[in-house]
Amino acid sequence: MQTSPDLTSARSVIRLLLFAKSRAVVAELEEHLRQHIQGLPGQYPAQLEVVPLEEHPYLAEHYKLVATPALVKAEPLPAQVLAGADLATQLEVWWPRWQGQAALAAHQEGAGRDPASPPTTEALLQMSEEVFLLRQERAQLREQLDFKDRVLAMLVHDLRSPLTATALAVETLQQGREGSLDKALERQLFDHARQQLRKMDSMITDILESARGAASELRIRAVETQLPGLCQAVIEELWPRIQGKRLQFQADIPVDLPSVHVDPDKIRQVLFNLLDNAIKYTPAGGSIRLDVLHRTSQKVQVTVSDTGPGIPEADQESIFSDSVRLSRDQQQEGYGIGLSLCRRIVRAHYGQIWVESSLGKGSSFHFTLPVYRLCKR
């Protein structure tokens, strides 16, 4: 834990703080200023201390610093900031006035008077640090609350469609209980209702996982898993939607893939989310690919590609943040948290996830998983 600069000496000492990004950056300037101060006339000494901004960011806010290096006369009050190329020259210009302020402070202390009873610099800086930390905490809480509000609003909107579709299917089945529906239509309605219920379940699962927060750890129960079967199950679940948009779908999943060491339920979520996004953003008649490759002896790589609108290069990293929702998403169902959840799951398996995309040419999402035999004990 970093300690605040020592600012507890008498007010008659001229206390100088040299702000810089780090100590190493201003080592030469610090030595130059110390030698320069020793050559200045005056009764009252100066104490110079280097303050690295990376250790005390709240001090930069307290003194309203806009550039570094900067020299701050912290005591006697009032504080004064010097900035620019030639701090030694500025110090020499202000030195007589600072000597006068130190003399006045010493006289008032000697007379038993507290000059205007101002808070000590130590107290001011401690309060500044507390205010800085409180502002940070408030900003983080506000961001979390805003995100939860957006999620709730989108959840209400997105659940309405599958709920309505399920209700219509159930009502139709209920009306046809007396035999007015043929078996093929009944089976189609049951399948449609089941598909919509799974869709709602997936939405709610994503919401619950996201609500745990980025800092929480996922509970991973890794076991030996065959990826071909897992991929096939997800494809079958999404197949009605693929057919409904007349999408061309291709899969290249070698039968001799090694087993992977994963939590099958969590990896199913990743596959479902990536394929669901590909279906969502690929226009009718477009194409989607699912490729699984034994990349190295240690990893298997999974790739989901589409011919959708693509993702701007500037957004290709931020899309994995739980608070980002691209402009292309505004007319689509979703929460802007699916990819964030995918990243958390993949990283929890010690894998990587990334995207390659060009505007107007589609996107390819890749992620890696550990091969099972390397995890045996």
UniProtKB/Swiss-Prot annotation:
PANTHER family recorded: HYBRID SIGNAL TRANSDUCTION HISTIDINE KINASE C (PTHR43547:SF2), TWO-COMPONENT HISTIDINE KINASE (PTHR43547)
First-level EC class: transferase
Keyword Kinase: yes
Source organism superkingdom: Bacteria
The enzyme's E.C. designation: 2.7.13.3
Phosphohistidine: residues carrying this PTM: 157
Function: Member of the two-component regulatory system SasA/RpaA involved in genome-wide circadian gene expression. One of several clock output pathways. Participates in the Kai clock protein complex, the main circadian regulator in cyanobacteria, via its interaction with KaiC. KaiC enhances the autophosphorylation activity of SasA, which then transfers its phosphate group to RpaA to activate it. In addition to its output function, recruits fold-shifted KaiB (KaiB(fs)) to KaiC to cooperatively form the KaiB(6):KaiC(6) complex (independent of SasA kinase activity).
GO molecular function per UniProt: ATP binding; phosphorelay sensor kinase activity
Domain free text: The N-terminus interacts with KaiC, while the C-terminal histidine kinase domain autophosphorylates and is probably responsible for self-oligomerization. The N-terminal domain stimulates the C-terminus to autophosphorylate.
Quaternary data: Homooligomerizes. Interacts with KaiC. Participates in the KaiABC clock complex, whose core is composed of a KaiC homohexamer, 6 KaiB and up to 6 KaiA dimers. SasA and KaiB(fs) compete to bind to KaiC.
Any Gene Ontology biological process: circadian rhythm
Record's protein name: Adaptive-response sensory kinase SasA
SMART domains in the cross-refs: HATPase_c, HisKA, KaiB
Segments forming domain Histidine kinase: 154-373
CDD domains reported for this sequence: HisKA (cd00082)
Keywords, in A-Z order: ATP-binding, Biological rhythms, Kinase, Nucleotide-binding, Phosphoprotein, Transferase, Two-component regulatory system
InterPro entries (alphabetical): HATPase_C_sf, His_kinase_dom, HisK_dim/P_dom, HisK_dim/P_sf, KaiB_domain, Kinase_SasA, Sig_transdc_His_kin-like_C, Thioredoxin-like_sf
SUPFAM superfamilies, A to Z: ATPase domain of HSP90 chaperone/DNA topoisomerase II/histidine kinase, Homodimeric domain of signal transducing histidine kinase, Thioredoxin-like
Stored Pfam families: HATPase_c, HisKA, KaiB
